Regions:
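Accessory beta-strand-rich segments of carbohydrate-active enzymes
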Residues: 37-41, 75, 96-213, 239, ...
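Disordered, acidic Ser/Thr/Pro-rich linker "stalks" and the adjacent N-terminal cap
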Residues: 29, 51, 55-64, 131, ...
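Intrinsically disordered, low-complexity Pro/Gly/Ser/Thr-rich segments with frequent PxxP/GP/PP motifs
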Residues: 259-287, 676-708, 795-822
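Terminal connector regions
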Residues: 285-318, 701-742, 820-847
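Short beta-strand-plus-loop segments that form exposed binding edges in beta-rich domains
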Residues: 164-168, 957-964
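Substrate-binding/catalytic cleft of secreted carbohydrate-active enzymes
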Residues: 380-551, 579, 583, 587, ...
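Substrate-binding clefts and catalytic carboxylate motifs of secreted carbohydrate-active enzymes
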Residues: 29, 36-44, 58, 63-67, ...
C-alpha cells in the first residue's frame, strides 16, 4: 500500500484563547491529515487505533470531507473513475467493507476552562468514534451529527489520537436508508465502490462554557409587505451539575435589531427557548427586505447572531442566516400551485440526482452550479431523494433565489429502511439543519411513491413539530395534485404544446416533477471522458456513459434517430456532437415553452430531469460534468427569461409569457422570417400588454411562398421606450423538423474583437462578434469560448452571456465571458469564435435511402387514440403507429411507389412489440413473399441486414405480440443495396 508521511492537525490560537464566540469550524480537523485502512486489515481494536503514535504508516492518505474510495483515487491507487470504463473495472469487494479513519491533533496550551467538543457534521453511513483509547459514541445514518464531550480525554499541549470506524451501508436502496442510496447505481450514474461511505462532511473542535447552544431557527410567522413577525428558537443545554443563570441575546442584521432574555437552566437541563414578536417587540420587523425566488425579486438575506452570557462572559454563540418570506399553496383544479410572499409563482427548474457522484462537490463548486441555474432563469431545484446534503448547497440556493423541493431518502417500491427509528431520527436531524433556509419550499416523502407505514405519518408529524408546518408536505413526488413524471426522452416539438386530449405523449400539464431528454455534450467534453479510439462510431463505452440500454428511459435510439432524421446522418463524433447541440436546444426550449404556454390554463410548474450533471454522460443535463454549456442550457436560458416572446410550434401563434412581478402595458412584438441566404421573407408586428402570470397572443404566423427548405424565425419584444425585453430565434423546415439543408449553408467568416478586464479575482472578456453585411448568409449557431494556451483549451467554468446564437448579415452581438482569474493560466486568455457554417459537415456519398420515408402506409387496425400508420414512416421517432389492443395477427404495409430491391429493414418499437413476425414483399399488394421471419423479436431497435427481395409493397406481419397490448412502431425503415446505412 502507498506510504504517507504522518501529519498532525495543529489546533491554533483560537482554542488556546477560547472558542467561545468563534465560528464552529474555526478549529477544523478537516483536510488531508487523515488516513484510511480496511477494518479487515487492522487487527487492533478502536481503543488501540485511537492512541497517539499508533503505527499507521501503511495506511492510505485520506481527505476529509471525502469518501474511502475517493481517497484511494486521490492517492493514485485507482484510475480516475470518470474516464472510459475505469469505474467498471474496479474491484468493488475491496471497498464494500468497513474502514477505519484515523488522524492526530494537538490542542495548544492556554485557557483550560470550559468544555471541548468533538463535532462531526456527517458520516456515511454509521460510525463509531474513539479518542485517546476511549469510545466516545457513534452516529447512525448519514444525516446524524455527532457532538462528543472530550474535555477529560484530550491532552492539552500534547498529541491526541482520533479514530473513526466507518460502516458500509447495508442492503439495497431503501433498506440502506438513510444513506446516499443512488450510490448503488442508477440509469445516469454507475455504482460507486464502497457506496460513498466516508466522513463526507466537516470535523471540528469547539469550546463552550457550561451552557451551549444548538439548532438556532429563525421563522417568519406573519408577513406583509410592511411588516414581518419573526420567532427565534434555540436549544440551550447546561452540561454542569449546577444551575446556571444567564442572558440569551441576539442581533439581527441588516437593521441592527437587538433583543435579549434572562434565562436560568437547572443542572443538566436542556431546554428549547422560543422568542416571538408578541413578547419581544424587536422581532416585529418594519418594511422587511423579502426573500424572493429568482426572477421575482431579490433573494434578500439576514443574519441572526445569538449568544448566551453568564456574568457578561460568552458561554456559547451561534450565527444563523435566514430570509424573510412566507410560502403558501393552493390546489385549484387539482393542480398544485406555489405562492411566495402572497404571490403565485411558476416553478421553472430542474432535478439534481447528486451534486457529484463521488461526493466531490464542495464549497464554491455549488456557487458555480447555482450561478448557472440563476443565469438559465430557473427558480427551483428538486433535491431528488435528498441526495445533496451539504450546507453549502442550501447556502448557494439561498443566495441565488433558488427554491428547493427537498426530499427524504426513499424510492418507490423499495420497502422500509432496515431500522425505521434511525430513519426517523435522521429525518428530524435534516429538518433541524435546513429549516432556517428560505430556499426550502416543499418537503417530499418519497420518489414516485408514498412512504410505507409508519414513515408517512411520522414525517408529517415531525415536520409539523420541527418546521411548524411552514412548508407543504407532499408524500409522493409525482402524485397528489401533481401531473406525474416523464417522459424522459425527446419528443417532437409540437407534442410539448399539446395536452393529453390532443395527441400528446406528455399528459396533463399541471405541476410536473420530472420531464427530460437525452443530452449529448459538446465534443470537447466527450474527449475528456472517452479515449480517442472510442470517440466514433458509437460503441460500448458510449453505453457505459448512458447512451444505450443503460438508460432506456432517455430513449437513446429515438434520440439518435431524431438527430439523423432532422439534421442528416453524422459522419464523425464532431459532426454528431454539433448536431446534438441543435437537437438539445430545440427540445429543451420546447419543454419549457410548452409548459409556459399553458400558464393560467392548467400548467403550474415544470422541473426538467435533470438540470445538472453528476457524472460525465450523454443524458439528462444542461451543462455537462466539466461545466461545458450544452444546447440544452441555451434552450432553457432562452425559454425561462421572466418576460418571454415565443413561437407555439403546434399552431404557429406568437405569444408572450410573463413570470415576473412586473406588468408591461405597452409592448411591441415583431417576427421576421429569413431564408438561409439572409434574405427577409416576412415581417409582422403587433402591440400587446403583458401581466404577471399570463401568456397572451400577439399574432398568428402565415408563411409566405419561396421559403428555403430550412429557414429562420426571429422574434423580438420591445417596451414603450424601444428597449429590448426579449429576443428569440428558431430554425424551421418547410417539411416538419427536417433541417438537413443546414449542412449546405454557405461558409461565413465572422469578425470578432475582445478586451479583457480583471476585478475581484474574476476575468471578463467583452466581445463583439459581427456577421459582415456582405456575407450573404446567416451565421448559424455561433459559439464564443474563452481559451488559453497554444492548444486553445477552453477555460471552464465560464459564464457567457449568450451562446448558440445566430447572426443575420450585418448583425453584431455584444457578449461577456467571465471566469475566475486563476483559471486563465499562463498568458492572457483569448476569445475563440466558431459557428455551424464555419466548419465542414458530413455529407453522405449518396442519399441515405430510406425508401419508406413519407410513403403511403396502411394497417390492419389503429388504436382509438389515433396513432395512424403514417406515423411509422414520417422519420420522426417520437410518433408511432399502434394497432388495436389484444389481437393477432396485425400488419403494417408500405407502398414504395414502384418495385424496389430491398436489402435491409430497421424497426424501432415502442413498448408494445412483436415477438413473432415476418417481413414480406409484394409486387401487387395481394401475393406476399417472406424475406425475413422470427419468433424471437426483442423490441427496441431491431436492425435486419442482409435481406434479399424486391417489391413495390413491404409489410410487417405480426403473428404474436410480445406484451399484453397491441403492436406499436415508432419507425419502419426500408433500404435498398445502394443505401449508405
Amino acid at each position: 500500500m502507498l506510504l504517507r508521511t504522518a501529519k498532525t492537525v495543529l489546533i491554533g490560537l483560537l482554542l488556546s484563547a477560547g472558542l467561545l464566540a468563534a465560528p464552529a469550524h474555526a478549529a477544523s480537523l478537516s483536510g488531508d491529515a487523515w488516513k484510511v485502512a480496511p477494518l479487515a486489515e487492522v487487527a487492533a481494536p478502536g481503543e488501540q487505533v485511537s492512541m497517539p503514535g499508533y503505527n499507521d504508516r501503511a495506511w492510505v492518505g485520506a481527505q476529509v470531507p471525502g469518501t474511502v474510495f475517493g481517497s484511494y483515487v486521490r492517492a493514485g491507487l485507482e484510475k480516475e473513475p470518470t474516464y472510459g470504463d475505469n469505474i467498471y473495472k474496479v474491484d468493488k469487494a475491496k471497498y464494500d467493507r468497513d474502514y477505519w479513519y484515523r488522524t492526530e491533533f494537538v490542542v495548544p496550551t492556554g485557557d483550560r476552562t470550559g468544555k471541548i467538543w468533538l463535532n462531526f457534521d456527517g458520516v456515511n453511513r454509521d460510525a463509531d468514534v474513539f479518542v485517546n483509547g476511549k469510545s466516545v459514541g457513534g452516529m447512525r445514518g448519514f444525516m446524524q451529527r455527532g457532538r462528543f464531550d472530550i474535555t477529560t480525554l484530550v491532552h492539552i499541549g500534547g498529541r491526541n489520537g482520533l479514530a473513526v470506524l466507518d460502516h458500509l451501508p447495508q442492503g439495497g436502496a431503501n433498506s440502506a436508508s438513510p444513506s446516499f442510496i443512488c450510490s448503488g447505481g442508477w440509469d445516469w450514474m454507475p455504482r460507486v465502490p464502497g457506496l460513498n461511505m466516508g466522513i463526507y462532511k466537516d470535523v471540528y473542535l469547539s469550546r463552550t462554557s457550561d451552557v451551549s447552544l444548538a439548532d438556532p431557527w429563525v421563522r417568519t410567522v406573519l408577513l406583509s409587505r410592511a411588516r414581518a413577525d419573526l420567532s427565534v428558537q434555540v436549544q440551550l443545554a447546561d452540561s454542569s451539575a449546577a444551575p446556571v443563570a444567564g442572558v440569551l441575546s441576539g442581533v439581527i442584521q441588516p437593521g441592527g435589531i437587538t433583543f435579549s432574555r434572562a434565562i436560568t437552566l437547572g443542572p443538566g437541563e436542556s431546554r428549547i427557548v422560543t422568542l416571538d414578536a408578541a413578547t419581544v417587540p424587536a422581532l416585529r420587523v418594519r418594511n422587511p427586505r423579502l426573500w424572493w425566488p429568482n426572477g421575482y425579486g431579490d433573494p434578500s438575506l439576514y443574519t441572526c447572531h445569538l449568544a448566551f452570557r453568564v456574568g457578561g462572559a460568552v458561554s456559547d454563540a451561534k450565527t444563523v442566516r435566514f430570509g424573510i418570506r412566507k410560502y403558501a399553496y393552493d390546489t385549484d383544479g387539482g393542480v398544485l400551485h406555489f405562492h411566495v410572499n402572497g404571490v403565485r409563482v411558476f416553478p421553472k427548474g430542474g432535478n439534481w440526482g447528486m451534486a457529484e457522484f463521488m461526493l466531490r462537490c464542495h464549497g464554491t463548486d455549488y456557487d458555480t452550479r447555482l450561478r448557472f441555474h440563476r443565469e438559465m432563469h430557473l427558480n427551483m431545484i428538486r433535491n431528488w431523494m435528498g441526495m445533496t446534503a451539504d450546507e453549502a448547497f442550501y447556502d448557494a440556493c439561498d443566495r441565488t433565489g433558488m427554491m428547493v423541493w427537498d426530499e427524504f431518502w426513499l424510492n418507490s417500491g423499495g420497502g422500509l429502511p432496515s431500522d425505521v427509528h434511525v430513519f426517523r431520527a435522521n429525518a428530524i436531524e435534516k429538518i433541524k439543519q435546513v429549516r432556517s433556509h428560505p430556499c426550502v419550499a416543499l418537503w417530499c416523502g418519497e420518489n414516485e411513491g408514498d412512504p410505507a407505514p409508519p414513515l408517512n405519518d411520522w414525517l408529517r408529524a415531525d415536520l409539523l413539530a420541527y418546521d411548524g408546518g411552514d412548508r407543504r408536505y407532499q408524500p409522493n413526488s409525482h402524485a397528489g395534485d401533481l401531473s406525474g413524471s416523464g417522459p424522459w426522452r425527446n419528443l417532437g416539438l409540437k407534442q410539448y404544446f399539446r395536452n393529453v386530449g390532443n395527441g400528446s405523449n406528455i399528459g396533463d400539464y399541471g405541476m410536473r416533477s420530472e420531464i427530460g431528454t437525452a443530452t449529448v455534450p459538446a465534443l470537447s467534453s466527450v474527449k475528456r471522458f472517452l479515449p480517442l479510439a472510442d470517440l466514433w462510431p458509437r460503441n460500448a463505452l458510449w453505453v457505459q456513459h448512458f447512451l444505450g440500454p443503460t438508460a432506456t428511459n432517455a430513449g437513446p435510439d429515438g434520440y439518435n434517430g431524431d438527430l439523423e432524421a432532422r439534421y442528416g446522418q453524422a459522419g464523425s463524433a464532431a459532426d454528431y456532437c454539433a448536431k446534438a447541440q441543435l437537437l438539445n436546444q430545440e427540445t429543451m426550449k420546447a419543454i419549457y415553452e410548452g409548459w409556459l404556454d399553458h400558464i393560467g390554463s392548467g400548467a403550474s410548474g415544470v422541473l426538467i430531469w435533470m438540470s445538472q450533471s453528476a457524472y460525465p454522460s450523454f443524458v439528462w443535463q444542461t451543462y455537462d460534468y466539466y461545466y461545458g454549456l450544452t444546447g440544452a442550457y441555451w434552450g432553457a436560458r432562452a425559454a425561462c427569461e421572466p418576460a418571454h416572446i415565443y413561437w407555439n410550434a403546434d399552431d404557429d401563434r406568437i405569444r408572450v409569457v410573463n413570470t415576473s412581478l412586473r406588468s408591461f402595458p405597452a409592448l411591441r412584438a415583431e417576427a421576421w422570417i429569413y431564408n438561409m441566404d439572409g434574405s427577409q421573407r416576412l415581417h409582422v408586428a403587433g402591440r400587446v400588454a403583458s401581466r404577471p402570470g399570463t401568456a397572451v397572443d400577439c399574432f398568428m404566423l402565415h408563411y409566405p411562398l419561396g421559403l428555403s427548405a430550412t429557414h429562420f424565425l426571429k422574434l423580438r419584444l420591445t417596451d414603450a421606450a424601444g428597449a429590448v425585453v426579449s429576443e428569440n430565434f428558431y430554425w424551421r423546415g418547410t417539411k416538419y423538423q427536417r433541417y438537413a439543408a443546414l449542412n449546405d449553408l454557405k461558409r461565413v467568416k465572422l469578425r470578432a474583437s475582445s478586451r479583457l478586464t480583471t476585478a475581484g479575482g474574476m476575468d471578463t472578456l467583452r466581445a463583439d462578434i459581427t456577421n459582415p453585411a456582405s456575407s450573404g448568409v446567416v451565421a448559424f449557431a455561433v459559439q464564443a469560448t474563452a481559451v488559453r494556451g497554444q492548444a486553445d483549451t477552453a477555460i471552464l467554468p465560464a459564464f457567457v452571456s449568450d451562446g448558440d446564437f445566430s447572426l443575420l448579415p450585418g448583425e453584431t452581438k455584444h457578449l461577456t465571458l467571465q471566469f475566475a482569474h486563476a483559471q486563465a493560466g499562463k498568458g492572457p486568455p483569448r476569445l475563440a469564435v466558431d459557428c455551424w457554417n464555419n466548419a465542414p459537415k458530413f455529407r453522405p456519398a449518396v442519399d441515405t435511402g430510406d425508401l419508406a420515408l413519407d410513403r403511403p402506409a396502411s394497417a390492419s387496425s389503429t388504436d382509438p387514440d389515433g396513432n395512424g400508420p403514417d406515423a411509422a414512416v414520417d422519420g420522426e421517432s417520437t410518433t408511432r403507429w399502434s394497432s388495436a389492443l389484444g389481437s393477432d395477427p396485425q400488419w403494417l404495409r408500405i407502398d414504395l411507389g414502384k418495385v424496389e430491391p430491398i436489402s435491409r429493414v430497421e424497426l424501432l418499437w415502442e413498448t408494445a412489440y412483436a415477438k413473432s413476425y415476418q417481413i414480406q414483399v409484394s409486387d401487387d399488394g395481394v401475393h406476399w413473399t417472406d424475406i425475413y421471419r422470427t419468433v424471437a423479436g426483442h423490441g427496441g431497435a431491431e436492425d435486419l441486414p442482409d435481406l434479399s427481395g424486391h417489391g413495390r409493397y413491404v409489410r410487417l406481419y405480426g403473428t404474436q405480440r410480445g406484451t399484453q397490448w397491441g403492436y406499436s412502431l415508432y419507425e419502419f425503415k426500408v433500404y435498398g443495396p445502394q443505401a449508405t446505412r
